[in-house]
Amino acid sequence: MDYFTLFGLPVRYPVDGSLLASRYQDLQRQFHPDRFASQPERERLMALQQAATINEAYQTLKHPLKRAEYMLSLHGFDLGNEQHTMRDTAFLMEQLELREELDAIERKADAQTQLASFGARVNETVKQRSALMIQQLDSQQWMDAADTVRKLRFLDKLQQQVEQLEEKLLGFE
């Protein structure tokens, strides 16, 4: 059973977050291992396994990029385990330039202002690529969507690096 079906949701990218959370809580109550404490070991293990599957499914469907990767896996694109090499050299060069720019920001006198501007640009790029990905998933352009998800992975990592630098500049690190 796929994760969408497990939660009683249609297999499509947009997910009602509050409905997902509500169904998650219902399933957690239904399959919580404590409810099976007095049952035979086999049933306890099955409940434990089901609870783990529910947790994994919820984390996957809750996170936009993981949800897209999961949808693609349902259509034969296993991005989590692939050894695919990014062939879009223009995109890769852009990523290298962005990382160099991020590295240089730390040494600037107005680093926080520069970082805020840089972060806003990255967020806008993520927003645009996410909109493209949603369009591709909705129109079942799986190969194109897989390529966009691969690019969003790079951008997601870049966003994390922006957050780490922000914490460092603010003295939280």
From Swiss-Prot:
Interacts with HscA and stimulates its ATPase activity. Interacts with IscU. Residues 2-74 form the J domain. PANTHER family: IRON-SULFUR CLUSTER CO-CHAPERONE PROTEIN HSCB. The lineage of its organism: Bacteria, Pseudomonadati, Pseudomonadota, Gammaproteobacteria, Enterobacterales. GO terms for biological process: [2Fe-2S] cluster assembly; protein complex oligomerization; protein folding. Belongs to the HscB family. Co-chaperone involved in the maturation of iron-sulfur cluster-containing proteins. Seems to help targeting proteins to be folded toward HscA. Keywords: Chaperone. GO terms for cellular component: iron-sulfur cluster transfer complex. Coiled coil: none annotated. CDD domains: DnaJ. This is Co-chaperone protein HscB. GO terms for molecular function: ATPase activator activity; protein-folding chaperone binding. The gene is hscB.
